[in-house]
Amino acid sequence: MTKVGLRIDVDTFRGTREGVPRLLEILSKHNIQASIFFSVGPDNMGRHLWRLVKPQFLWKMLRSNAASLYGWDILLAGTAWPGKEIGHANADIIREAAKHHEVGLHAWDHHAWQARSGNWDRQTMIDDIARGLRTLEEIIGQPVTCSAAAGWRADQQVIEAKEAFHLRYNSDCRGAMPFRPLLESGNPGTAQIPVTLPTWDEVIGRDVKAEDFNGWLLNRILRDKGTPVYTIHAEVEGCAYQHNFVDLLKRAAQEGVTFCPLSELLSETLPLGQVVRGNIAGREGWLGCQQIAGSR
């Protein structure tokens, strides 16, 4: 039996309004619990369009057929008009998710975090996280115990900023296994649960065809030497590719693969490490990567 942490990122208004209810229904039918990370502030994701001038981002958008994958409402959100606030407008959906799944903060403003947080000072970052946590807690009526940085934009500054909130764990980086990042003080920080597996949009049209993706991914899961964690997006697997996701769950069950919330992957003793800026194939720009203590 192979246990895989299932993380669901919700980036947009449409992903929350349309994708999350579909995913909740799918997961209920398959008796699966997951960790769902919500963006709760303005939906400004369309402002990423300026990144089309960067060849790597343009190629990603073309090979993944982004217009069909996400829809033009997502691709243009917050461009010619202010982005709609996601959280309170979809409070009932978020509360329903929290009844059955582990719910955490993805971002206040997903676009702002992904585009600008790398240049924020620590207090600006703390204020932004606090705003998101406060909003999500108002919606679900209970403390939020976990978070996942938007776009995996995380480094030592993010690690230090999140210590102020005493969360149970964060999932801010890519890596191989859960660990505790070393703080500037030399003490271990809040547990990190890295994503170990590639997302749909990182590999489609580059490493694998859409129709072959599920078999390809299951092979990666079964060969994973660490603690496998897989991320799906409400805007993808909850919308245009929900049938592919259902097929993945059926095939996974046949292979003895089970999915669980990320918190179930935590253990009392974790290795020490750091979150450093790095790059991975299929994703434009830097992102947080796990570095085990003592490695280079």
UniProtKB/Swiss-Prot annotation:
Enzyme Commission number(s): 3.5.1.n3
Enzyme class: hydrolase
Pathway: Glycolipid biosynthesis; 4-amino-4-deoxy-alpha-L-arabinose undecaprenyl phosphate biosynthesis; 4-amino-4-deoxy-alpha-L-arabinose undecaprenyl phosphate from UDP-4-deoxy-4-formamido-beta-L-arabinose and undecaprenyl phosphate: step 2/2; Bacterial outer membrane biogenesis; lipopolysaccharide biosynthesis
Domain NodB homology: start-end pairs: 2-260
Gene Ontology terms: cellular component: membrane
Catalysed conversion reaction: 4-deoxy-4-formamido-alpha-L-arabinopyranosyl di-trans,octa-cis-undecaprenyl phosphate + H2O = 4-amino-4-deoxy-alpha-L-arabinopyranosyl di-trans,octa-cis-undecaprenyl phosphate + formate
NCBIfam families in the cross-refs: PRK15394.1 (NF011923)
PANTHER family reported for this sequence: 4-DEOXY-4-FORMAMIDO-L-ARABINOSE-PHOSPHOUNDECAPRENOL DEFORMYLASE ARND-RELATED, GLYCOSYL TRANSFERASE-RELATED
Function comment: Catalyzes the deformylation of 4-deoxy-4-formamido-L-arabinose-phosphoundecaprenol to 4-amino-4-deoxy-L-arabinose-phosphoundecaprenol. The modified arabinose is attached to lipid A and is required for resistance to polymyxin and cationic antimicrobial peptides.
Protein's name in the database: Probable 4-deoxy-4-formamido-L-arabinose-phosphoundecaprenol deformylase ArnD
The organism of origin for this protein: Escherichia coli (strain 55989 / EAEC)
Gene name per UniProt: arnD
